[in-house]
A protein has these predicted regions:
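Conserved functional hotspots at enzyme active or ligand-binding sites that engage polyanionic ligands
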Residues: 1-115
Length: 115
C-alpha cells in the first residue's frame, strides 16, 4: 500500500501503558513514502470539552470531513505520536485534504515545540 503524509488509516494503536492495543484511526505525519516505518498521530471519537492547542476537532459539518473517511466527529491528537511499521496498517480510510493538513500541521508544530 502506498502511503503518504495526510493519509488517514486504521492501525493497532497501543494504550499508553503498553498493556494492550486497539484498532483505531490515525493520520500519517511522516513524509517519506519509501520508509518502512511511518509516524502517526492518534485520532479519537471521544471529544474533549475544549480541544487542547495540540488537538484539532473535525466534525461531520466540516467541509473536510467526507474526504477523511471517518464515520464520527473526531479529534486529531497531534501530541500522541507513534512510529510503527507500515505493515501494521489495516487499511486506508481517507486522506486529509490541503486545508485539513494545514490545520493539523499547526497543531503538530505546537505539539513538538516548533510553534
Amino acid at each position: 500500500m502506498d502511503l503518504v503524509r495526510g493519509d488517514i488509516v486504521l492501525v493497532p494503536f497501543p494504550f499508553t501503558d503498553l498493556t494492550s492495543s486497539k484498532v483505531r484511526p490515525a493520520v500519517i505525519v511522516s513524509a517519506d513514502p519509501q520508509a518502512v516505518d511511518v509516524t502517526i498521530a492518534f485520532i479519537s471519537s471521544v471529544l474533549p470539552g475544549i480541544p487542547a492547542k495540540t488537538e484539532f476537532l473535525l466534525t461531520a459539518k466540516d467541509k473536510n470531513f467526507a474526504a477523511s473517511g471517518l464515520k464520527k466527529d473526531s479529534v486529531f491528537k497531534m501530541s500522541k505520536l507513534l512510529a510503527i511499521s507500515s505493515s501494521l496498517i489495516v487499511r486506508r480510510l481517507g486522506r486529509a485534504n490541503a486545508s485539513l493538513q494545514k490545520e493539523l500541521d499547526v497543531c503538530l508544530a505546537k505539539a513538538v515545540g516548533l510553534a
